[in-house]
Amino acid sequence: MEPTFDIPDSTDWLDTPLTLLAPFETSLRCQVCKDFFDNPVITSCSHTFCSLCIRRCLSTEGKCPTCRSSDQELKLRRNWVVQELVEGFKNARPSILQLARMAQTGTDDSGDLAAEEPASKKRKIEPNAIVGTDGLPEEGIRTRSQSRGASRQPQATPVQVIDDGNDEDYMPDGLVPCPVCGRRMKEEAVFRHLDSCTGTAEELKPAAFGSLAPGPRKSFLAATGKPPERLPVINYSLLKDTVLRKKLKDLGIPNWGPRALLQRRHTEWLNLWNANCDSRTPKPKRELLRELDVWERTQGGNSVTPTDPTNAVMNKDFNTEEWSANYDTDFKALIANARKKNDAVIRSTIPNASQANSDTPRSAQLVDQPIEASLTPQDVDEKSTMNPQDAIDNRTEVPPVPDPPQALSGIDRAVNSPMKNVTEGDAQAIPISSSASTHKTPH
């Protein structure tokens, strides 16, 4: 059978006649943890929270959880009135709730009984009742007040049964009581005990170390005699890793893990320690270390994160083909958008990239194509009858070609060479295009 947990909540009053206590109890609960205030403190914006809850919020966001206004940890002040209200209500809550539920049950039962009772409410006197000389009823008849008083009378105390020595199941323990204080002890120790016996029974002492029964817990204030001092907030950006690890070691908390984990661990320890300073009965350090260990296993370095490879396990019934078919359109759209962005980046970084790409085949065609291939038979005849001097003068009409190939190196040598070194054979060796033959320089 699974255990049931009775968690107190403000909605417990809604099923009772005291429904107005529901909003009252809600006002005594923290808006962060939804539990009764524990060491309540008030902020600069006049909102009350648990000391640990508001310190965690301020260390993370620096804002009030209720009104979202900026606040600082140094401005927090203890709210003793709310603490006393919470303690008093927590002590009286079980009794008040029990009485309210009993009243609700009694009201329902009385309504059912009233429906079953007849209209006449006259009482009949029993015939064998005996009436006294003074006119008061005797034991045969009891009035309502007498019945009520009899029900309030305490019942008889239970009779104490003394074991008889003749009982078969009696097992003597070999101890005898002291005739003065009644303490049981061995027979040979009675005489030594009588010399120091005061006549009163000694009170039971708390369990010693190593016993199964735990002794009463002492607070930090009772153990040390002075309240704990608050820890200051430090700027982690000014501390190196070695200094930060040494500071954690001096505080008695773990100093392993990366720098981010060290900062989170130190911040949590500051919140636990300073919140404990707001309590009337501070906890000992070992309990705070136990709470830090719980945080370590749930949110710290020992917690199970979603990035753990042991948890990255796909469902065995997962259908990859169906998933791909359902989201194929989305995948194609993402790929198309990625290509468009890539082309846009290329055009933005190289403005003439598209124009250069379109002109590249034409330039290659002009370079690779021989000049003689573009000549007509008429141009060939004109070339044969052309004056060498005209060919030299028309050399400037040839359009410049960027990065000329080796086939045109002869033209460059002819153009760049001095005029006096040009012979008739060199002039005839220079190929002339159709454009050059049509645009002749007049003499």
UniProtKB/Swiss-Prot annotation:
GO biological process: DNA repair; mitotic recombination; postreplication repair; protein monoubiquitination
Chain intervals with Polar residues compositional bias: 143-157, 350-363, 431-443
Keyword Transport: no
Chain's role: E3 RING-finger protein, member of the UBC2/RAD6 epistasis group. Associates to the E2 ubiquitin conjugating enzyme UBC2/RAD6 to form the UBC2-RAD18 ubiquitin ligase complex involved in postreplicative repair (PRR) of damaged DNA.
Molecular-function GO terms, alphabetical: single-stranded DNA binding; ubiquitin protein ligase activity; zinc ion binding
The SAP domain, residue ranges: 239-273
Organism this protein belongs to: Emericella nidulans (strain FGSC A4 / ATCC 38163 / CBS 112.46 / NRRL 194 / M139) (Aspergillus nidulans)
Gene this chain is encoded by: uvsH
ZnF endpoints (UBZ4-type): 175-202
EC number: 2.3.2.27
Subunit (UniProt): Interacts with E2 UBC2, forming a complex with ubiquitin ligase activity.
Region (Disordered): 106-157, 350-443
Protein name: Postreplication repair E3 ubiquitin-protein ligase rad18
